[in-house]
Amino acid sequence: MSRTYKATGINLKSMPFGEADRLLTILTREQGLVRAVAPGCRKPKSKLGGRSALFVVNDLMLVQGRSLDKIAQAETLESYPGLSQNLAKLTTSQYLAELTLYQALSGQPQTELWDLFCQQLTQLQNATLAQVPCCLIHGTLKLLAGAGIAPQVHACCVTHQPLDPPTSNPTWRVGFSAGAGGTVTLTGPPRPRTAIQQAAEQAIAYPLGADYRVQGKLSAQELALLQDLNPAEIQPASPLPLPLIATYPLVIWQGVESALRHYAEAYFDRPIRSAALIDTCFTPLPDLTSVPS
Protein backbone atom coordinates (compact mmCIF):
# COMPACT_ATOMS: atom_id res chain seq x y z
CA MET A 1 0.00 0.00 0.00
CA SER A 2 1.45 3.33 -1.04
CA ARG A 3 1.82 6.23 1.35
CA THR A 4 2.55 9.91 0.93
CA TYR A 5 5.21 11.93 2.67
CA LYS A 6 6.57 15.46 2.58
CA ALA A 7 10.17 16.53 2.08
CA THR A 8 12.25 19.53 1.08
CA GLY A 9 14.67 18.58 -1.66
CA ILE A 10 17.07 19.82 -4.30
CA ASN A 11 17.35 18.11 -7.68
CA LEU A 12 20.85 16.71 -8.18
CA LYS A 13 20.31 14.57 -11.25
CA SER A 14 17.68 14.33 -13.98
CA MET A 15 17.10 12.00 -16.91
CA PRO A 16 14.21 11.34 -19.33
CA PHE A 17 11.90 8.55 -18.23
CA GLY A 18 9.19 7.07 -20.43
CA GLU A 19 7.42 9.25 -22.97
CA ALA A 20 6.91 12.44 -20.95
CA ASP A 21 8.35 11.90 -17.47
CA ARG A 22 11.68 12.52 -15.79
CA LEU A 23 13.50 10.43 -13.22
CA LEU A 24 15.00 12.72 -10.58
CA THR A 25 17.63 12.04 -7.97
CA ILE A 26 16.78 14.41 -5.14
CA LEU A 27 18.71 15.21 -1.99
CA THR A 28 16.17 15.85 0.76
CA ARG A 29 16.73 17.15 4.25
CA GLU A 30 14.39 14.60 5.82
CA GLN A 31 14.90 11.39 3.81
CA GLY A 32 18.35 11.76 2.26
CA LEU A 33 18.58 10.63 -1.35
CA VAL A 34 15.27 9.97 -3.07
CA ARG A 35 14.72 8.69 -6.61
CA ALA A 36 11.36 9.89 -7.84
CA VAL A 37 9.44 10.18 -11.09
CA ALA A 38 8.15 13.61 -12.09
CA PRO A 39 5.11 12.54 -14.16
CA GLY A 40 4.39 14.44 -17.36
CA CYS A 41 7.02 17.10 -16.64
CA ARG A 42 8.33 17.04 -20.23
CA LYS A 43 4.97 18.10 -21.61
CA PRO A 44 4.90 21.77 -22.72
CA LYS A 45 2.35 22.97 -20.14
CA SER A 46 3.36 20.76 -17.22
CA LYS A 47 3.47 22.45 -13.82
CA LEU A 48 6.38 20.20 -12.91
CA GLY A 49 8.48 21.25 -15.90
CA GLY A 50 10.56 24.00 -14.30
CA ARG A 51 10.35 22.37 -10.89
CA SER A 52 12.18 19.29 -12.18
CA ALA A 53 15.20 21.26 -13.44
CA LEU A 54 18.64 20.78 -11.91
CA PHE A 55 19.39 22.56 -8.64
CA VAL A 56 15.81 23.64 -8.01
CA VAL A 57 14.73 23.43 -4.36
CA ASN A 58 11.13 22.28 -3.86
CA ASP A 59 8.71 21.55 -1.07
CA LEU A 60 7.57 18.11 -2.18
CA MET A 61 4.63 15.80 -1.65
CA LEU A 62 5.72 12.33 -2.72
CA VAL A 63 4.00 8.99 -3.06
CA GLN A 64 6.14 6.06 -2.01
CA GLY A 65 6.33 3.23 -4.53
CA ARG A 66 7.93 -0.21 -4.59
CA SER A 67 11.13 0.89 -6.34
CA LEU A 68 10.57 4.52 -7.34
CA ASP A 69 8.63 7.25 -5.62
CA LYS A 70 6.39 9.69 -7.50
CA ILE A 71 6.09 13.44 -7.12
CA ALA A 72 2.48 14.37 -6.44
CA GLN A 73 3.04 18.07 -5.75
CA ALA A 74 5.99 20.46 -5.86
CA GLU A 75 6.31 24.07 -4.77
CA THR A 76 9.55 25.83 -5.68
CA LEU A 77 11.39 27.51 -2.81
CA GLU A 78 14.70 28.39 -4.46
CA SER A 79 16.56 28.09 -7.74
CA TYR A 80 19.98 29.13 -8.98
CA PRO A 81 19.47 30.64 -12.45
CA GLY A 82 22.92 32.22 -12.46
CA LEU A 83 24.59 28.82 -12.62
CA SER A 84 23.20 27.95 -16.05
CA GLN A 85 24.28 31.28 -17.54
CA ASN A 86 27.99 30.46 -17.35
CA LEU A 87 29.66 27.18 -18.36
CA ALA A 88 32.33 27.35 -15.65
CA LYS A 89 29.73 27.86 -12.91
CA LEU A 90 27.45 25.15 -14.30
CA THR A 91 30.30 22.64 -14.58
CA THR A 92 31.51 23.47 -11.07
CA SER A 93 28.01 22.99 -9.64
CA GLN A 94 27.72 19.61 -11.38
CA TYR A 95 31.15 18.62 -10.04
CA LEU A 96 30.10 19.45 -6.46
CA ALA A 97 26.79 17.66 -7.02
CA GLU A 98 28.64 14.46 -7.94
CA LEU A 99 30.70 14.63 -4.74
CA THR A 100 27.48 15.19 -2.80
CA LEU A 101 25.79 12.21 -4.45
CA TYR A 102 28.70 9.91 -3.66
CA GLN A 103 28.42 10.50 0.08
CA ALA A 104 24.66 11.02 0.50
CA LEU A 105 22.61 8.26 2.13
CA SER A 106 19.03 7.17 1.52
CA GLY A 107 16.33 6.74 4.12
CA GLN A 108 17.79 9.01 6.77
CA PRO A 109 18.09 12.77 7.35
CA GLN A 110 20.90 14.55 5.53
CA THR A 111 20.40 18.04 6.94
CA GLU A 112 24.07 19.00 7.24
CA LEU A 113 24.97 17.79 3.75
CA TRP A 114 21.87 19.47 2.29
CA ASP A 115 22.69 22.79 3.95
CA LEU A 116 26.34 22.58 2.90
CA PHE A 117 25.56 21.87 -0.74
CA CYS A 118 22.99 24.66 -1.00
CA GLN A 119 25.44 27.02 0.66
CA GLN A 120 28.05 26.18 -1.98
CA LEU A 121 25.58 26.83 -4.81
CA THR A 122 24.70 30.24 -3.36
CA GLN A 123 28.36 31.12 -3.02
CA LEU A 124 29.08 29.95 -6.55
CA GLN A 125 26.17 31.84 -8.08
CA ASN A 126 27.31 35.08 -6.43
CA ALA A 127 30.98 34.61 -7.35
CA THR A 128 32.83 36.49 -10.07
CA LEU A 129 34.31 34.46 -12.90
CA ALA A 130 37.80 34.76 -11.40
CA GLN A 131 36.53 33.35 -8.09
CA VAL A 132 35.05 30.16 -9.58
CA PRO A 133 38.21 28.00 -9.24
CA CYS A 134 38.44 29.01 -5.58
CA CYS A 135 34.75 28.13 -5.11
CA LEU A 136 35.38 24.70 -6.63
CA ILE A 137 38.38 23.80 -4.49
CA HIS A 138 36.99 25.33 -1.29
CA GLY A 139 33.67 23.55 -1.86
CA THR A 140 35.42 20.26 -2.59
CA LEU A 141 37.40 20.49 0.63
CA LYS A 142 34.25 21.26 2.62
CA LEU A 143 32.50 18.22 1.16
CA LEU A 144 35.51 15.99 1.85
CA ALA A 145 35.68 17.34 5.40
CA GLY A 146 31.97 16.69 5.85
CA ALA A 147 32.55 13.08 4.79
CA GLY A 148 35.40 12.79 7.29
CA ILE A 149 38.10 12.40 4.66
CA ALA A 150 39.74 15.83 4.50
CA PRO A 151 43.34 15.27 3.39
CA GLN A 152 46.27 15.78 5.73
CA VAL A 153 48.59 18.32 4.10
CA HIS A 154 50.85 19.61 6.86
CA ALA A 155 52.85 16.41 7.39
CA CYS A 156 53.67 13.16 5.62
CA CYS A 157 50.93 10.65 6.44
CA VAL A 158 53.47 7.80 6.57
CA THR A 159 56.50 9.27 8.35
CA HIS A 160 54.55 12.03 10.16
CA GLN A 161 57.35 14.46 9.40
CA PRO A 162 56.20 18.10 8.95
CA LEU A 163 56.15 19.42 5.40
CA ASP A 164 57.48 22.90 4.64
CA PRO A 165 57.19 23.33 0.85
CA PRO A 166 60.16 25.17 -0.73
CA THR A 167 58.11 27.42 -3.01
CA SER A 168 61.25 28.72 -4.76
CA ASN A 169 62.13 25.19 -5.96
CA PRO A 170 60.11 24.43 -9.15
CA THR A 171 61.13 20.75 -9.24
CA TRP A 172 60.12 19.81 -5.68
CA ARG A 173 57.21 17.36 -5.42
CA VAL A 174 55.25 15.51 -2.75
CA GLY A 175 52.90 12.57 -3.29
CA PHE A 176 49.15 12.69 -2.69
CA SER A 177 47.47 9.44 -1.66
CA ALA A 178 43.89 8.59 -0.74
CA GLY A 179 45.07 5.40 0.94
CA ALA A 180 47.45 7.31 3.19
CA GLY A 181 44.97 10.12 3.77
CA GLY A 182 46.89 12.97 2.16
CA THR A 183 50.49 13.94 1.51
CA VAL A 184 53.25 11.33 1.28
CA THR A 185 56.94 12.10 0.87
CA LEU A 186 58.39 10.47 -2.21
CA THR A 187 61.73 9.56 -0.62
CA GLY A 188 62.72 7.92 2.62
CA PRO A 189 61.49 4.76 4.37
CA PRO A 190 58.27 4.77 6.41
CA ARG A 191 58.44 4.96 10.19
CA PRO A 192 58.44 1.48 11.80
CA ARG A 193 55.01 0.31 12.87
CA THR A 194 54.05 -0.22 16.47
CA ALA A 195 52.37 -3.40 17.71
CA ILE A 196 49.05 -1.54 17.88
CA GLN A 197 49.40 -0.37 14.27
CA GLN A 198 50.23 -3.89 13.13
CA ALA A 199 47.17 -5.26 14.93
CA ALA A 200 44.97 -2.58 13.36
CA GLU A 201 45.95 -3.51 9.80
CA GLN A 202 43.28 -6.17 9.56
CA ALA A 203 40.52 -3.71 10.54
CA ILE A 204 41.12 -0.93 8.01
CA ALA A 205 40.82 -0.67 4.25
CA TYR A 206 44.40 0.50 3.67
CA PRO A 207 47.04 -1.37 5.73
CA LEU A 208 49.40 0.98 7.54
CA GLY A 209 52.40 -0.95 6.27
CA ALA A 210 51.31 -0.88 2.64
CA ASP A 211 53.16 0.72 -0.24
CA TYR A 212 50.64 3.53 -0.69
CA ARG A 213 49.55 4.18 -4.23
CA VAL A 214 50.02 7.84 -5.07
CA GLN A 215 47.12 9.33 -7.05
CA GLY A 216 49.04 12.48 -7.91
CA LYS A 217 51.91 14.77 -7.05
CA LEU A 218 51.84 18.32 -5.74
CA SER A 219 54.37 21.03 -6.49
CA ALA A 220 55.63 23.21 -3.66
CA GLN A 221 53.23 26.03 -4.56
CA GLU A 222 50.30 23.62 -4.85
CA LEU A 223 51.04 22.21 -1.41
CA ALA A 224 51.44 25.74 -0.03
CA LEU A 225 47.97 26.62 -1.36
CA LEU A 226 46.46 23.52 0.23
CA GLN A 227 48.16 24.32 3.52
CA ASP A 228 46.79 27.87 3.37
CA LEU A 229 43.31 26.42 2.79
CA ASN A 230 43.93 24.19 5.85
CA PRO A 231 41.54 21.27 5.17
CA ALA A 232 41.81 19.94 8.74
CA GLU A 233 40.28 23.13 10.15
CA ILE A 234 37.76 23.92 7.42
CA GLN A 235 34.16 24.30 8.60
CA PRO A 236 30.82 24.49 6.74
CA ALA A 237 30.58 28.20 7.56
CA SER A 238 34.18 28.99 6.58
CA PRO A 239 34.15 32.01 4.22
CA LEU A 240 35.62 31.91 0.74
CA PRO A 241 39.36 32.69 1.13
CA LEU A 242 39.37 35.59 -1.33
CA PRO A 243 42.91 36.84 -0.53
CA LEU A 244 44.34 33.56 -1.83
CA ILE A 245 42.93 34.27 -5.30
CA ALA A 246 45.42 37.10 -5.71
CA THR A 247 48.25 35.07 -4.17
CA TYR A 248 48.26 32.00 -6.42
CA PRO A 249 48.00 31.91 -10.24
CA LEU A 250 45.32 29.90 -12.00
CA VAL A 251 47.69 27.06 -12.92
CA ILE A 252 48.25 26.36 -9.20
CA TRP A 253 44.50 26.17 -8.53
CA GLN A 254 44.18 23.81 -11.51
CA GLY A 255 46.93 21.58 -10.14
CA VAL A 256 45.26 21.39 -6.73
CA GLU A 257 41.90 20.60 -8.34
CA SER A 258 43.46 17.72 -10.27
CA ALA A 259 45.06 16.28 -7.13
CA LEU A 260 41.85 16.57 -5.10
CA ARG A 261 39.84 15.06 -7.96
CA HIS A 262 42.01 11.94 -8.11
CA TYR A 263 42.03 11.75 -4.30
CA ALA A 264 38.21 11.83 -4.18
CA GLU A 265 37.82 9.41 -7.09
CA ALA A 266 40.15 6.92 -5.43
CA TYR A 267 38.36 7.20 -2.09
CA PHE A 268 34.80 6.95 -3.43
CA ASP A 269 35.85 4.56 -6.23
CA ARG A 270 33.70 6.60 -8.61
CA PRO A 271 34.68 8.96 -11.46
CA ILE A 272 33.80 12.66 -11.36
CA ARG A 273 32.44 12.85 -14.90
CA SER A 274 31.90 16.60 -15.02
CA ALA A 275 35.61 17.13 -14.34
CA ALA A 276 36.29 16.48 -18.03
CA LEU A 277 35.16 20.04 -18.77
CA ILE A 278 36.98 21.77 -15.92
CA ASP A 279 40.22 22.52 -17.78
CA THR A 280 38.28 23.79 -20.79
CA CYS A 281 36.14 26.05 -18.61
CA PHE A 282 39.03 27.63 -16.76
CA THR A 283 41.56 28.04 -19.57
CA PRO A 284 40.11 31.34 -20.88
CA LEU A 285 40.13 32.95 -17.42
CA PRO A 286 42.61 35.79 -16.81
CA ASP A 287 45.57 35.15 -14.54
CA LEU A 288 44.20 35.27 -11.00
CA THR A 289 47.22 37.21 -9.74
CA SER A 290 45.82 40.23 -11.58
CA VAL A 291 42.61 40.16 -9.54
CA PRO A 292 42.67 42.68 -6.67
CA SER A 293 42.13 41.26 -3.20
From Swiss-Prot:
Gene3D superfamilies: Nucleic acid-binding proteins (2.40.50.140), Recombination protein O, C-terminal domain (1.20.1440.120). Disulfide bonds: none annotated. The keyword DNA damage applies. The keyword DNA repair applies. Keywords: DNA damage, DNA recombination, DNA repair. One of its GO terms (cellular component) is bacterial nucleoid. One of its GO terms (biological process) is double-strand break repair. Involved in DNA repair and RecF pathway recombination. Belongs to the RecO family. This is DNA repair protein RecO. It comes from Acaryochloris marina (strain MBIC 11017).
